[in-house]
Amino acid sequence: MEILLDEPINLEQVADLCAIGMKRKPPTPRNYSLWHVSNLLQSGHLIAKGDIRYHEFEGAPYGIMSWGRIFESAIDCYLTHYAVNLGGFYTPDVESIKDDILGSLDGMMWLPDLGWLVCETKLRFTLNGEIPLSHLQQIRAYCHLAETDIVCYVSGHITSRPPVAEARMRIVKLTEQSIHETWQGIVSTKECLIGHGCCPIGNAV
């Protein structure tokens, strides 16, 4: 993995851009009849512990999940502005499917110097700036779907003690091997689940 850019995001600028806003369609409701990248990654961790099932969240979203969506919407405004300033463009809420597995990308960006980038935004309640392995696995899978090896990873960090709110944007180039191995692991997880009679809840009989 090669870090091409690592810089802080001015949250006051983000707030100003949110005030201007951006016109967009609401995201497509989640299709529970399909296999999803994020669910299969979670299922892989469960299988490693001997719990063979397809991981799906059921019920009303937690408030913390809603805050994550709010942060993503704010960063969409920032990434749109960032891309246009560099002669490119940003498209939020992109879906891609391969091997009957759906990935719901936070967005895709095109920049003249780099081409296509997968964009992923995370809100974290820690100041730890390392990219977690679970996030890396997710963006590797999305890179496979988008047929690129470059990622724009934005992380928001909030803590109460001390009270801190900050955000960083990193542009990272992943290795083709890591992308391929991650996707093969996801496909293997799906095949394992099918072999044990598991399926998405939308396909349950």
Which residues does each PLM region occupy?
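Cysteine-cluster motifs in flexible loop/terminal segments that predominantly coordinate metals
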Residues: 40-46, 192-205
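Polar low-complexity intrinsically disordered regions
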Residues: 1, 81, 113, 203-205
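Nucleic-acid nuclease catalytic cores
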Residues: 65, 84-194, 198-200
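Charged, glycine-rich intrinsically disordered N-terminal tails and low-complexity linkers that flank
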Residues: 1-78, 82
